[in-house]
Structure formats: C-alpha cells, structure tokens
C-alpha cells in the first residue's frame, strides 16, 4: 500500500508515466496491457486499475498509439510509443538522472554545492 500512496503525487505521476513509456518502448511493435502491467510491477507495486488510466492519459497526450491485433481468436489491444513519446521519454530519462543523483547525494550525506 505504501508505494501505491507514493505514486499518486505529481512526481509519482510523472515517474509512472516515464516507467510505462520505458516499458512500452522496449518493443518496436508495441505491447499489450497485461504485459505492461507485469513489466511495470518488476519495478514498483502497482495495480492494473492504476495503470490503465496512465495508458489512456499517455494515448491522449499522443505519447502512445493504440491498435488491435488478433490473438487466440480475439482482439488484443496493443500500445506503441510514438515519436512524441520517444522525445518525452528522453526528457524523462534526463530528469530522472538529475533527480536520482540529488537523492543519492542526500542519502550519502547531503548535497554538495
């Protein structure tokens, strides 16, 4: 429950967007919701009911495109990172590097100016 609470603030929402974009970007042809959930859960404890609104938000922002593909006689919805999404992911990676560096400095005894 602790990590669920943590990801609800604005930093957490951006972090969750970044993690989802990173997971989806690993597959050139895109990937489907259940697999995205499983892969994200390798990093943080998050429910499907939390992730699907993130996928919709990323789609609405044109960071992800969506298409259906047949699987075992039914349609499976796939998500794929757009060029806009790739640009956003690059920015998220840069911000994460700076942010995590500052946090590491704090953990190791304070930020040096």
Label each residue range with its predicted role:
Residues 61-75, 80:
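Beta-hairpin "wing" of winged helix-turn-helix
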Residues 8-52:
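N-terminal helix-turn-helix DNA-binding core of bacterial DNA-binding proteins
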Residues 53, 57:
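Alpha-helical DNA-recognition elements
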Residues 1-7:
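Short, small-residue-biased leader/transition segments that mark boundaries at the very start
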Residues 90-113:
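Amphipathic alpha-helical dimerization/coiled-coil segments
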Residues 2, 15, 76:
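Short coil/loop residues immediately preceding or within conserved phosphate-binding loops
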């Amino acid at each position: 429950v602790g990590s669920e609470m943590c990801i609800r603030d604005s930093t957490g929402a951006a972090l969750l967007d970044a993690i989802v974009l990173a997971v989806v970007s690993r597959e050139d042809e895109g990937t489907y919701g259940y697999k995205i959930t499983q892969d994200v859960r390798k990093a943080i404890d998050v429910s499907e009911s939390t992730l699907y609104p993130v996928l919709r938000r990323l789609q609405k922002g044109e960071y992800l495109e969506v298409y259906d593909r047949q699987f075992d006689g039914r349609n499976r919805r796939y998500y794929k990172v757009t060029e806009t999404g790739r640009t956003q992911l690059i920015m998220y990676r840069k911000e994460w590097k700076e942010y995590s560096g500052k946090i590491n400095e704090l953990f190791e005894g304070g930020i040096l100016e």
